[in-house]
Every structure is written in structure tokens, then in C-alpha cells.
A protein has these predicted regions:
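Mid/C-terminal beta-alpha module of Rossmann-like enzyme folds, strongest
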Residues: 2, 202-266, 281, 292-296, ...
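N-terminal Rossmann NAD(P)H-binding glycine-rich loop of SDR-like oxidoreductase domains
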Residues: 2-22
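Glycine-rich "substrate-gating" loop/helix at the edge of Rossmann-like oxidoreductase active sites
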Residues: 155-165, 185-197, 221-223
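A conserved pocket-lining segment of Rossmann-fold NAD(P)-dependent short-chain dehydrogenase/reductase
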Residues: 173-194, 206, 213
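Conserved beta-loop-beta element that borders a ligand/cofactor-binding pocket
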Residues: 104, 136-161
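NAD(P)H-binding glycine-rich loop region in Rossmannoid oxidoreductase-like domains
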Residues: 35-95
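Conserved Rossmann-fold NAD(P)-dependent oxidoreductase catalytic core, especially the SDR/UDP-sugar
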Residues: 86-131
Length: 310
């Protein structure tokens, strides 16, 4: 049995499909209101803030994947991430199962230094601190050999379906709704977004490869990084038309944050949009040289087709 904790997000859904396709037919989907991605999926409604719920959710599980998402609220992240991680660690210990933790880069400092698996977790923003607390708990449990676990870390998402992320929301969703695409701060700095189907495929591969445990892995991204200007130029090329986009400066975003809670919550992350954001996944590519990473050009094509953007 392989169990996905937080199965209704885009990562959890794609992970469930990948696991069933290539690794395991016994799959349990856990969430507050889980929904099947395949008729044979097992469903288990649980609140991961409740230790007994979490223990029951992992009964008879061999590998657990923690892909849960929390509301985009700094106070909730700072309060709840460490509780969830403590509960999941204890539940894995009780049920003697492995853990694959899907993490993001919020705990990294927002500078232009290349991000690797050894980059310190040193961000001082509330969301970053919440994620640091969770990761630190797991790293300590791994070091103390309390649990057999692995951390899979990913940068900002872009992808088809219900993928959430700045690039999807500000570029592709706006194009889909015949609105002007927007980018934050600068269009001439390099980005390293990850294609969500690649993230899920890579996490399934890591989870089912025994020698990957006890480590942190950066999930694979295209190394041919694009600026937002280049990204939108590629969209123009594929659509065969000009796209006029708008760059939102800090003052505009700050003013907007007084009227938009999601934008207010995003202010913590703004520094990374003013610099080259280089997320290095060479460790994964060295270990798994046959894994096919989706190019940005192909990822854009898939999203444009999925969103029916003409």
C-alpha cells in the first residue's frame, strides 16, 4: 500500500496516477474530502492536525507521501506545518512505513546564489519559517534514525490542469480569460519553474528507489532557463501572435496588497522575482540519467493546449 497525504492537489493527483501506472495498484488517498483519480483508489477522510486520524490514515502503508497544501496564510503555515510534520512522523513510526516529503523552496534565502540540496534553510519570512520548522523536524528524525524518509524539494510550479503558481495564474490564466498577462518586478531575470507532471513522476521514482532515502533531492527542471520575456516570446511563437504583457513594480504590488489578501501573502516572496532564481537539480539527473525532463517549450505547448488558448 502506498498512501498520499493531501491527495487532492495537482501534485497528489498526478502522483496517484503515476504510482498506479508504474509502481503500485494499492493506493490510498487521504484528505479532508478525498476524491478518486481511479475507480480502485481507497479513500480515507482525515485531518492531519489530529494525531489519531493520521495514524489511522497510514495503517498497512509501506510508503507515505506528504503532499498536503495549507491555505495561503502565513500564520497558518507558521502554526500548522510543524504540527502536521510531528503527527506524520509519529504515524510513520507507529505504522513502520517510509515517508516521502514534498517540500518547496520557501525556506531558502531569496538571493541569486545557486540553490542546491545543501542550501541552508535560513529564510526569515513567516511562510519560510513554517516550512523550515517542518523540514528541520524531519531532518532530525532522519538523523536519529527514527524514520526512513526522503525530502523532495521543488521550486515554483507551472503546468496543466489545476496547477497553482504565479506563472500559471498571472500568465496562462490571464491568456485563457482574454486578459493581459502580468509578471512581477522584472522580465529579464532567469526563472526555474518546475513542470508539475515532472515533479510527480520524479517523486514517485524517488519514493520507490530504496537508495534515495535519508537525503534531500531537488526535483528535476529544464536547465535551459528562461526569463519571463523569453517565456512569453515562446508563447507568442507558438500562438503566432503578439502578446502585450505588463510588469508590476513593487509600489503597485504593495498598494494592491491592501485590497487583495493573496497578494499580501505573496509580498514575502517578492525578492526572488527581482533576481536570477537558479534551482539546481543536477543531483537527480546524475542519479536518474534516463528521466526525461519536459523542456519549457514543450511544457508551454501542453499548457496552451490544455487551457485551449489560441
Amino acid at each position: 500500500m502506498q498512501t498520499i497525504l493531501g491527495a487532492n492537489g495537482i501534485i497528489g493527483e498526478e502522483l496517484a496516477r503515476e504510482l498506479r501506472k508504474n509502481y503500485c495498484s494499492d493506493i490510498r488517498l487521504v484528505g479532508r474530502n478525498p476524491k478518486k483519480t481511479h475507480p480502485d483508489d481507497q479513500l480515507f477522510a482525515a485531518d492531519l492536525l489530529d494525531i489519531q486520524n493520521t495514524i489511522e490514515a497510514l495503517k498497512n502503508t509501506e510508503i507515505a507521501y506528504l503532499t498536503v497544501g495549507l491555505p495561503y496564510d502565513s500564520e497558518i503555515w507558521l502554526r500548522d506545518w510543524q504540527i502536521i510534520m510531528k503527527n506524520v512522523i509519529e504515524a510513520c513510526k507507529f505504522n513502520q512505513c517510509k515517508l516521502v516529503y514534498f517540500d518547496n523552496t520557501y525556506a531558502y534565502l531569496q538571493n541569486s546564489i545557486i540553490q542546491t540540496e545543501t542550501t541552508p534553510l535560513a529564510c526569515q519570512g513567516k511562510k519560510g519559517r513554517g516550512k523550515k520548522l517542518a523540514a528541520t523536524l524531519l531532518l532530525k528524525a532522519i538523523a536519529n534514525k527514527e524514520i526512513d524518509a526522503v525530502i523532495c524539494r521543488a521550486p515554483e510550479f507551472y503546468g496543466p490542469g489545476k496547477t497553482k503558481g504565479l506563472t500559471n495564474g498571472m500568465v496562462f490564466e490571464n491568456l485563457k480569460n482574454n486578459k493581459q498577462p502580468k509578471v512581477f518586478l522584472k522580465d529579464n531575470v532567469k526563472r526555474t519553474p518546475i513542470f508539475t507532471p515532472d515533479a510527480s513522476r520524479a517523486m514517485a521514482l524517488i519514493g520507490n528507489t530504496p537508495d534515495t532515502y535519508g537525503q534531500t533531492w531537488h526535483l528535476p527542471c529544464d536547465d535551459n532557463r528562461l526569463t519571463y520575456n523569453q517565456f512569453i516570446t515562446e508563447i507568442e511563437k507558438q500562438l503566432g501572435r503578439t502578446i502585450n504583457f505588463k510588469i508590476l513594480n513593487y509600489f503597485t504590488l504593495k498598494v494592491g496588497s491592501f485590497f487583495n489578501k493573496n497578494l499580501k501573502e505573496t509580498l514575502e516572496l517578492l525578492p526572488r522575482y527581482a533576481i536570477d532564481n537558479i534551482f539546481d537539480s543536477s543531483k537527480f539527473k546524475t542519479r536518474f540519467p534516463n528521466f526525461k525532463v519536459t523542456s519549457y517549450q514543450e511544457g508551454i505547448r501542453i499548457i496552451l493546449n490544455d487551457f485551449h488558448i489560441k
